[in-house]
Regions:
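Short glycine-rich His-centered loop
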Residues: 27-39
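A short, hydrophobic beta-strand-centered structural micro-motif
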Residues: 25-29, 78-108, 112
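Bacterial N-terminal signal peptides
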Residues: 8-16
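Amphipathic beta-strand/beta-sheet edge segments enriched in Tyr/Trp
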Residues: 95-140
Length: 160
């Protein structure tokens, strides 16, 4: 009987200590699209890729509402996102990931995507990556490529 109780206690302690996960907050910024337009499908694909990959890797995920701008922000990204980072920190986020999706005026496809990963406390840049827009044969190819790009970011969190 003592062995059973010891075994149950061991399993309980094992699961209690492994029950935590990092929380990652996402923020999508669209620039170069008219403010009155509808949600862009490519922005939605990026957001879905972030959620899918990070959730599948065991992270708690949340997001801020997408923001649409006429052009890239004039101030530094760190200053521009400060309110969103503060809100994420207050919500318990450990990491904050920004995807700035830049569109050219004559296309609804992204011309460039900047992905920037920050540690929230203390606030510091971990990884920055720029991706040039591409044309894909199918939506499945595009989704697979986006997920692979995002999968390359996940190990950076594990380094900290």
């Amino acid at each position: 009987m003592a062995k059973k109780i010891t075994f149950v206690l061991f399993l309980g302690v094992l699961f209690v200590f492994n029950a935590s996960a990092y929380m990652v907050s996402f923020f999508i910024i669209e620039s170069g699209l008219p403010p009155e337009g509808t949600k862009n499908q490519y922005s939605q694909l990026w957001e879905n890729a972030f959620f899918d990959v990070f959730f599948d890797a065991g992270y708690i995920v949340c997001n801020s509402p997408m923001m649409r701008l006429d052009s890239k922000p004039k101030m530094s990204l760190e200053n521009f996102i400060q309110d969103e980072v503060d809100e994420a920190r207050d919500g318990g986020a450990d990491y904050f990931l920004v995807a700035q999706i830049d569109f050219s005026r004559d296309s609804l496809r992204p011309s460039e995507v900047s992905i920037v990963l920050f540690k929230v406390t203390p606030f510091r840049l971990i990884k920055e990556k720029k991706i040039t827009g591409k044309t894909y044969k199918s939506e499945k190819d595009e989704i697979d490529d986006l997920r692979n790009i995002v999968k390359g970011i996940v190990p950076k969190i594990n380094e900290f």
